[in-house]
């Protein structure tokens, strides 16, 4: 994110295929520029997503990792149905201490998964593939590790709950960024969101 499409091309040539972007316009611009030359790039949306912007990425996005509210989820469902797609999503869990971080509490996640199980017709257009989380921005590695571990426990609880409509799809735990990804990997992350450690500081 915040890096030019040429950086994506370089990473692609090095073997990377999954790319995350956190701004809708930048994502659309990169997709339009690269889609013909690099049709196998897998685009994930990983940042705050406004409901009125979902329509711009619904036709091509491979996964929305940052579903943070029921209102946003409803709009993703609506736009996915509009374009005849099923969009893979992750539900973002709010475990960090900062109020600025967004997402569902663990109890809200449990309640939402139960609703999706009980009323699947309300959630057509999305497929639940797992959870996403951002840890607190602190130096205390023990605190960060415990936050990641708590999300992993919730992930495993949901996998064993019998409430997932497609349990075989519920495989992704996206947590960890450039500053804390080793801790996330130790706590079970399957996706890590590495930007500056590969591309340098944001432009």
PLM regions and their residue ranges:
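Gly/Pro- and small hydrophobic-enriched strand-loop and loop-to-helix capping segments
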Residues: 189-203
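Conserved alpha/beta-domain cores
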Residues: 2-181, 185-187, 199
